[in-house]
Amino acid sequence: ATLPNLLLTWATTTSPPLITPGEGDLELTPEILAAFTQTLASHQISLTFLSGSWSPALADLIPASAPDMGMLILGAETIYSPAATEAFVEILIVLLRRVKMAKAMVGAKNYYFGVGGSVDGLKIACAAKGAVAYEIENHGVPGLEAGVGRSLVEVQMF
């Protein structure tokens, strides 16, 4: 997830909504940014963003929380090829093992034509590393059935 995507999604949940889903444009004023920051603070949410290739070195950059705390990892469009899937799952497993209660939510196309990544490939790669990955029921969500289809996959250690 990127900060702009989180901001746009948050803006659809305000009362009244600052933007309607699918609209896509939101002028970021100091007031809107302050309201977003206040919402995060009031729910005790902290965000950490990193950029780089999926690798064990990237895992070292991600701050560790206390082992008895929880962790939620969000990922999207990270499994476009079998090599990318393997690299993503490798770092995902490292992060999921850091705490007792951890899960990842991964949004992806069911199949990436021409490059070979797939949701099924993600599930197989996770199982090979001792994790379970399963698709979350999402019938009726606009846009998920169109084209090759999209899935939301939850990953946890077992």
Which residues does each PLM region occupy?
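S-adenosylmethionine-dependent methyltransferases
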Residues: 1-158
